[in-house]
Amino acid sequence: MTVRCVLATIDLEGLGLDRGGHLLIQHALEGVPVGAEVLVRGNDPSLRVHLGAWARSQGHTVRDGAIVVRGSATSARWSGAERAGGYAPNGAVQHPGPTWGVAARGALVEAGGPTLRFDLEDKDLVWSDLAPRLYAQAAASQWDPNTAVEWDAPFDLPAEVEAAVVQVMTYLVENEQVALIVPARFLGRIHPHFREVLQVLAVQAADEARHMEVFARRAALRGGPLGVSGAGGRASLATLLNEPDFALASFLLSVLGEGTFLNLLGFLEVHAPDPISRSITALARQDEARHVAFGMAHLEHQAALDSALRARLRAAVERRHDALMETVGLNQQVFDALVLLAAGSWQPQAIARGYAAVEQLQHAMDDGRQRRLVRLGFPHDEAKALSALHTRNFM
């Protein structure tokens, strides 16, 4: 039943509907019920022609050329709308509506529209309560490779030591490229309702892009060619690219791979022979720590809800180990370069110290993996066994 109200009046003066006058009329109509009349005045010569056309397009009627009678079309349009959860992180729903698509979380979603499906649209498969805080930290910690690193810092290295640095940097670039591709692949598969997760993965990819830049830039700093890329290392990294499951990919890359890399970057921060290499590995290490933290938080959340997750994680480690059994693992040139960097010279005693330092690094990597596995609920003996199966290529 329509409601007949006393006329309201709006004066557009010289403003035409083709210049924004419709906004004032629409605003006036929103304040009256269906069936109410609004008198529209103005001195634009096309007002009456435009008013009739606009009113019909909006489901209203016009009488006497200047009185708009509010229709019900606008109200009816939103009668079946629903809220897409709430704006805040605790407003994320378990399963977003099939027609919500890319609507912002918390928006009022008009009924209808296309059904947009995402592979990962179950909150438990992607969520971490830590994601909003990690994203905020990451956004506040972004650094510019051109200004955060003193690229013209003076240093002079023997040719063999410079070659060792170049080899390690070449290896780091190779690994960082994969560390960028993996999260980037999942960005298009996760429902945007879980925007904090997308933000974390997006900034993670941006982090890796910077790491690729600074490591490649240091490798080429003295104008020589880059180092070698071993087939075994590339085979190890390919297994990360071939993993389609988000939880398993996060586990293999972030918890095991990048977690192991934290130790390597810390090692280089101490033993790198020049200030630029020490600086860029320190910067990268800060970023990688966030990546590991998100991977752990996500898997801890999922493990608390899915008792079968640990069996799947175990199977992923074993499957990857079996696939890489025939490969040589870490490139010998990379291992030797790490020894030389830790040694600092070609003296036998120095080389012995360098070799011991790399062995200690590998033990620290193993200890770190075991601690993270225990945090995910694996018994200590199983954590030790699974850590031992991790790729010899570190990542």
Regions found by a protein language model. Give the residues of each.
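Terminal targeting/low-complexity segments that flank the catalytic cores of oxidoreductases
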Residues: L24, S75-Q199, A220-L221, P225, ...
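A beta-strand-loop signature enriched in Asp, Gly, Thr, and Trp
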Residues: I280-A284, H291-R320, L324
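Short glycine-/small-residue-rich flexible loop motifs, especially phosphate/cofactor-binding loops
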Residues: G52, A216, G266, Q370
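Short glycine/serine- and small hydrophobic-enriched flexible loop segments
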Residues: R185-G188, G266-V270, A297-E300
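Active-site-proximal alpha-helical scaffolds that flank and shape metal-associated catalytic sites
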Residues: R217-A289, R319
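Alpha-helical transition-metal enzyme core signature, strongest for iron centers
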Residues: A55, L172-L180, L201-A219, F251-L262, ...
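Intrinsic disorder
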Residues: M1-G52, R56-G106
